[in-house]
Amino acid sequence: MEKALHRISSMNAALPDISLTDAAPGRRPLEWVGMQGIDLPVVVAEPGCRRDVHARADVQVDLPAPQVKGIHMSRLYGLLDGLADGEALSPAGLQRMLRAMVDSHRDCATRSARVRLRFDLLARRTALVTEGLAGWKAYPVRLDATLSGDAFALRAQVTVVYSSTCPCSAALSRHWIEQAFLTAFGHEARVEPTAVAAWLKRHATAATPHSQRSEAVVSVALPADGTTLGLLDLIDRVEQALGTPVQTAVKRADEQAFAVLNGGNLMFVEDAARRVQAALEDRHASPRVRVRHLESLHPHDAVAWAAPLREGADAC
């Protein structure tokens, strides 16, 4: 094997490389050049989550030298492949990799590098009520790391799926049931509790509010000197703010508890965005929120964005 690799290395040394020998015909600098959609196994250290995940990576460097025909993509690929060596992803590790990418392209006058990683964080989630019952839930994650000169920036984006019940629809449903109750019992001076209970058992769902699966996409800046990514903590904060995250394994008691949570957390899309933003702004830097309710009443979605006031709402 070593002899074969040596022969290949010797052949590469003798093979032409037009990215070095040929001049760029247009002679223009390029903002970013690189690759997208590289498959990569990475390790993510989050409590209660699977460590080994399949990621898709995008990686680029800038090409400010107008005379250089092309960058060295194999160098970027090799450095990116180092993320698969078993060390857990961290801000420091991503910064080291980007610095190495810039250093590997000094002959291109490169000053900046960036990487985007997409993967699903698989977390174990327990049932709401039933002891010993649990299941796995996947949370889409995106990491964006950029090094420009000496400035390193890292953002994490997570997607949380939850249930939303429309407050307006709930009010209309309650009104319908109220009127139906008055029609049934309004003429009576006294109503026995058992009769009320029997009526409710039969008619309490004569009108039901519409609810739907919804999603919150949250992006926050991570500290450059952080030792971990803190993804599960971010996800937990979003789910706690919303109050109705979708469940994995359930039995009837858990489904009932979920119905109670929905009834206690009626929300418009505006309510959801404000809840999440308020839960994050004291803990995370530059939180940005986008929520989407996949309306069951309409064929279109309801959406809202939130961002720090000084940044505007150009979120996620």
Curated annotation (Swiss-Prot):
EC number assigned by the record: 3.5.4.16
Feature type site, description May be catalytically important: C166
Pathway(s) annotated for this protein in UniProt: Cofactor biosynthesis; 7,8-dihydroneopterin triphosphate biosynthesis; 7,8-dihydroneopterin triphosphate from GTP: step 1/1
Enzyme class: hydrolase
GO molecular function: GTP cyclohydrolase I activity
GO biological process: tetrahydrofolate biosynthetic process
Superkingdom of origin organism: Bacteria
Keyword annotations of the record: Hydrolase
Reaction it catalyzes: GTP + H2O = 7,8-dihydroneopterin 3'-triphosphate + formate + H(+)
Similarity comment: family membership: Belongs to the GTP cyclohydrolase IV family.
Function noted in UniProt: Converts GTP to 7,8-dihydroneopterin triphosphate.
Protein name: GTP cyclohydrolase FolE2 2
Species the sequence originates in: Burkholderia orbicola (strain MC0-3)
